[in-house]
Amino acid sequence: MTSSLKKIALLKQGLGKNSPFAAGRQGTLQAIEHLGYVQIDTISVVERAHHHILWSRVPDYDLSHLNSLVRERQIFEYWYHAASYLPMKDYRYALPAMMSVRKGESRYFNRGDQHLMNEILARVRAEGKIRLRDIDKKNKESLGNWWNTGPGRRAFEQLYMQGDLMICERNGMEKVYDLTERCLPENIDLSLPTLYEYAQYLFNNTLRAHGAFTWKQLVHLKKNDLKETMRVVLKEQIDAGVVSAIKLADGQTLYVDVTAIEQQLDTDFGLKILSPFDNSLIHRDRLTSLFEFDYRIECYVPAAKRVFGYFCLPILYQNELVGRIDCKAHRTVKELEVISLHLEKTVKDKEHFFFELDQELKRFAAFNQCSTVNDKVVKLIRSKL
């Protein structure tokens, strides 16, 4: 049963060897709409997480696809559990968070200078889209770097989080803002969802993207009335025969998509090097309970205390998470360096594993704009097995 549940979870995540998504930009949109969100991250020791997550799923993925889809008003940037790309069709479900920020209920976004915010809005309304560094040069000269780290940045963040500004494109990682009304497609639904509708939205995202989950995983970071409303939605879905409750050996109850249970699960998963911020990995409780994989990203850990490496990437092989590989893209010399490789004892058919890893590293190098792979560490470990 555990093996089947792993396969369900991976298939729902679009991580089978044969992608369920179309190629190119259309597949990128399909993947984001299916997953519900893709997390944005700035770490660039290898290609950034939002690109990596989509590259792992979408054939012929290109780094330009996200900006293209934002310009086409098919996706937008906002907060999910972190900064993320979200489907534009789900825009109305971001409205409660925007309203909360506007009311001053946010712990983190309630410090914008109202006078400066009004000035920024007036300028954008008159002159068009704007970057943080486009703020009045006189202010920059007289007040040093205030516009980048102090009131200026906070004002932009406040306007963005409360829904007055949207990110209309990026130049690299630099954000370009415009008025929200200029960024939204015509006839978009702007009705505020009820608490019940919002709970349904969150439940459907989890069911569609994961297929199997515990109560703890379903309501992760959810509180109070929302949490209780999600309990109502879950019960309704069980009663309707959409979800089946399965008791695991450890006593936990797992809620599983009934249609997924009935699917053929003999899919080949191959080998994939995943991002630490991949949707399949981001909830660590899911990893330990379903995959028995204790994973921790170590870039925030002091160097002396790291075990697996600064930016160790999980390795998916068949339907198991079997190791961690720490890589660095040396872009000036176009070389992908494998710094370390740590394998679990569960790796089966090691010869085939290393063949698949070699192929994946070549693909991963090309994705990182590298033409060669320094895999001396891999060869050394392979020789000792």
Task: State where each predicted segment sits.
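Long, charged, low-complexity, helical-prone intrinsically disordered regions
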Residues: M1-L385
